[in-house]
Amino acid sequence: MNHNAYTYTSGERRPIEVLVFSMDPAVVDEFIRVDHEIWTLKEAFMDGLAKIPFLSKEVWLDDSKPGEVTIVFVWDTQQQWDAVGNVEFQQQLQREFDSRFPHPITLVAAPHEDSRFGIHRVTRFERKQ
């Protein structure tokens, strides 16, 4: 076993946000682009934050469900997630997003809300590049 080929981290407690959206498959690429330009970058560089508040944000597509987009955030801390969750800030971003992405979308699931924000990453195994 080559231990230099991977990293393993345990003992974490990183809050996880999962959002599942449904839309016309023809607009998925546009959604991903506008989501990145509005939500990802503006939440990452929100005024008043000392650093990017999330460790990662991934966008997943399921070939068996065209038009379904799953977004997964790994937040650094719940406090940083809460800061970005400021209602006025979120409403501002939603207005900007809606002005750039006029297509209908449906929030299908938000498992982190169903679990009362109880989903956390506790270990991570990653292959080194």
Q: Where does each model-flagged region fall?
A:
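Short S/T/G/P-rich N-terminal loop/turn motif that feeds into the first structured element of a domain
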Residues: M1-V69, V74-Q91, R95, H103-Q129
